[in-house]
């Protein structure tokens, strides 16, 4: 089966962005029970009911409880950010040569958004630091320069934010690279397939998002996928609780 999450929102967020949806209205007010959200979550629930998707151990694909399910073949597919590549090399060495990286499915071939960025640990410079300018310069080099981005791929297996690296085949198809050796597809082919269709959810930078994330990953998704609660009912419940929290 394909992995369904209850402690993360990788698949739901992707589907929501593909549909042009969000967790908030344009004015920033809460809208976690909007029609697009209902459609996306219901699609996932229908897939679960059909046996094509189910809750993965630990609630999401990136945890030690889930890794054995890949090795056993119980989990056939998972939608994850590109940094998941490193987990395969660290925890699932027996699957070398058996795992493919592909662009995620879409609702329609002509959809503007094909994928979104997901996860990752943010890096920030403290503005009050006496060396803030120097720190910002160093981080800009680490995050953006060609040289550093090549090593982001070589060492970490992450998709470099400097997309110029994506077309340098001496880097992306280097036969000596551990990630090129592990996967049975060319990893950067998937990135190039979706390069012009990378979207985002604007709510990611909103102050309400931590509470929304907590609500979905502790209650809403479990209510739907573990307890069988009606999708609209679960989302209405989340909307009410969050509105109460923020006084809307």
Task: Report each predicted region and the residues it spans.
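Extracytoplasmic/periplasmic solute-binding protein
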Residues: 1-31, 36, 66, 75
């Amino acid at each position: 089966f394909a992995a369904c999450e209850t402690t993360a929102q990788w698949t739901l967020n992707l589907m929501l962005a593909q549909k042009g949806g969000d967790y908030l209205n344009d004015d920033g007010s809460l809208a976690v029970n909007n029609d697009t959200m209902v459609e996306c979550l219901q699609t996932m629930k229908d897939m679960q009911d059909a046996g094509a998707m189910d809750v993965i151990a630990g609630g999401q694909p990136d945890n030690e409880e889930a890794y054995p399910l890949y090795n056993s073949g119980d989990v056939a597919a998972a939608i994850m950010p590109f940094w998941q590549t490193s987990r395969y090399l660290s925890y699932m060495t027996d699957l070398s040569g058996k795992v493919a990286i592909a662009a995620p499915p879409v609702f329609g071939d002509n959809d503007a958004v094909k994928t979104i960025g997901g996860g990752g640990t943010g890096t920030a410079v403290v503005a009050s630091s006496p060396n803030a300018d120097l720190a910002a310069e160093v981080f800009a080099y680490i995050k953006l320069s060609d040289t550093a981005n090549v090593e982001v791929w070589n060492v970490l297996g992450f998709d470099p934010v400097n997309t110029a690296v994506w077309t340098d085949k001496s880097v992306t198809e280097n036969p000596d690279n551990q990630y090129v050796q592990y996967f049975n597809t060319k990893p950067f082919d998937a990135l190039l397939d979706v390069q012009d269709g990378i979207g985002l959810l604007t709510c990611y930078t909103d102050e309400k998002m931590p509470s929304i994330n907590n609500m979905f990953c502790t209650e809403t998704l479990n209510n739907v996928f573990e307890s069988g609660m009606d999708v609209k009912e679960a989302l209405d419940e989340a909307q009410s609780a969050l509105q109460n929290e923020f006084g809307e």
